């Protein structure tokens, strides 16, 4: 099949159309703004897959309806998914704006004195507001000279934030969520809401029974040579942890090998179901070779699969990581227990950063007093107000061990295009594979076990659906915390020591849900959350506003909150504005 092209960023230079001196004097400056914007975006951004971002500039400056239509025709033919309109001068507001109702759009009005770029910006935004097509405002804080072609830091920040979020919107549109299985143990996020995916994300849901996975394994609908490669890779790289099962439930070497083989096969088959695999056509399985065009997936597993077959922990952990037997590659997004709403938070984080995402239970709040009582240790530093134990049954991306290093040598999780094979190997070396606990997983399996290094900035997110309101997003920026080994061991053994752990300390504001760490835990809307590397809550807020998903909880500084200009007309409290604007405009792809 022809590979679907990636969305591009459209740049729209708009200009005062009056000839006989006005337009002519502005052509070069206006087009240079467009070129500078395109140069910035192509230099600083990449798609989540690692490919370079492409910008498409209008063939001419846009002064009115005819040139706007010509620009739109070009953009439509080149898969432009978001637009940035730029101008240093007055132009004709509603005659020059981008009118596509679902395409994210921003306007940069040059802050200069010679020509009123700010006046056009205000006029165009008024037209957008009146027509119900929200747009983002970009206006530099300081006046620039007319011949200054530099992009100020504050303008650059907004251009990049808008573009990152807009690319995420455009990249999700038209894709699918592969729901492999149904509802897992009554978890609400696995009651997959087709209307949410269609109306807010522009996606479809592909519902597939888990028997399809069984069929592919049993009928050998996979690349057998790749399976041998995967087994050899696991033999070389997997370290195995202790088997905590009672002796009657422990498997012998032959049985353990069969469990490992099936776990790796599950990873291969789920991947093939998501994105297709041309190798399957070579063995006569043309239909299966196409895949389901899935940008994210979820696997029910418990309990209808896991009571008989190996659990999804190994498959999910490998798919969610930035590497496997084929080397370093783009991580997939696969939600444990088919928690589609956590899967959407994972998808957002991956699209914004290009990094792997850590799926976890928001398991336990440990107060400083409780930790001191149980271990004798007094918390300090980032952990002084208490910590949250983020832990799940082994499906978290192995990148979450944070054995990768940034340019200053600090532990981190990198975009996959920056990860070396040495760093991938270090993440594998930091991971143990522990036999699944029989009482939970009767069909066996292996859970990955690692401990996230401390002092790493993270953003924890979660999407929830509220009846009568729709989807909402929660955001909590904070850091991973490193505890003394003996303290970690005592706390970890009180739950399940065969699973991966991140000790998380959210940044507190002293207000509302961020009054203290207990309040963060108490206000979290579900049993799962996602960790995305870095303090990127502002990017999530911008993305959510594009999709019309209100943010019900965040600890991002107010100066970093960036939403469409029309939000300001919905009241004076910025969080109340968000709710009213999202309700007023409705989901991006209204259905």
From Swiss-Prot:
Q: Which family does it belong to?
A: Belongs to the L-fucose isomerase family.
Give me the gene this protein comes from: fucI
State its location(s).
Cytoplasm
What is the catalytic activity of this protein? Answer: L-fucose = L-fuculose
Keyword terms, alphabetized: Carbohydrate metabolism, Cytoplasm, Fucose metabolism, Isomerase, Manganese, Metal-binding
The prosthetic group or cofactor this protein requires is: Mn(2+)
Pathway connected to this protein: Carbohydrate degradation; L-fucose degradation; L-lactaldehyde and glycerone phosphate from L-fucose: step 1/3
Q: Which GO terms describe its molecular function?
A: arabinose isomerase activity; L-fucose isomerase activity; manganese ion binding
Reported EC number(s) for this entry are 5.3.1.25
Q: How does it assemble?
A: Homohexamer.
Q: Which domain of life is it from?
A: Bacteria
Q: Where does Mn(2+) bind?
A: 337, 361, 528
| GO annotation (BP), single | L-fucose catabolic process
From the Swiss-Prot or TrEMBL record, give the protein name: L-fucose isomerase
Q: What does this protein do?
A: Converts the aldose L-fucose into the corresponding ketose L-fuculose.
Annotated S-S bridges: none
Q: Which InterPro entries match?
A: Fuc/Ara_isomerase_C (IPR004216), Fuc_iso_dom3_sf (IPR038393), Fuc_isomerase_C (IPR015888), Fucose_iso_dom1_sf (IPR038391), Fucose_iso_N1 (IPR012888), Fucose_isomerase (IPR005763), Fucose_isomerase_dom2_sf (IPR038392), Fucose_isomerase_N/cen_sf (IPR009015)
Q: Name one GO cellular component term.
A: cytoplasm
What is annotated as the active site?
337, 361
Entry keyword Isomerase? yes
